[in-house]
Design a protein with these regions (language model features):
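Active-site beta-loop-alpha substructure in enzyme catalytic cores
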Residues: 3-42, 46-48
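Generic detector of short, aliphatic-rich beta-strand segments that form the cores of beta-sheets
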Residues: 1-2, 86
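C-terminal beta-strand edge segments of enzyme domains
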Residues: 51-112
Length: 112
């Protein structure tokens, strides 16, 4: 399995993307929605790791999750700190990418 940063999303040479974030509890629905969207648009597994706890003005709920390549939730922490485990099925990912080869319609470019 290869893990790349989000700027190489059109290359199809990665299988999972890790997002580390500090989304406050008041925006937890946005966090969950964006994780699913990133998995679908990149045709990759997404591992979302979000902050927990409080600071003087905000509460951070966690809501870390593992999302499948079709946007389905494979594991979810809910509120607070949790250890998540999930099986990332590379055969399923390959079949999905072959059935929907959207990555082939990408423009490869460099930002300078």
């Amino acid at each position: 399995m290869c893990i790349r940063d989000r700027w190489s999303r059109c290359r199809n040479d990665y299988d999972a993307i890790i997002y580390v974030a500090s989304w406050p509890a008041g925006r937890r629905d946005v966090w969950r929605t964006l994780l699913r969207a990133r998995a679908i648009e990149n045709q990759a597994y997404v591992l979302g790791v979000n902050r927990t706890g409080d600071d003087p003005r905000l509460h951070y709920s966690g809501d870390s999750a593992v999302i499948g390549c079709k946007g389905e939730t494979l594991a979810e922490a809910g509120e607070g700190q949790r250890l998540l485990t999930a099986r990332l099925d590379m055969d399923e990912l390959r079949r999905f990418r072959e059935k929907f080869p959207a990555w082939r319609d990408a423009d490869d470019f460099d930002l300078k």
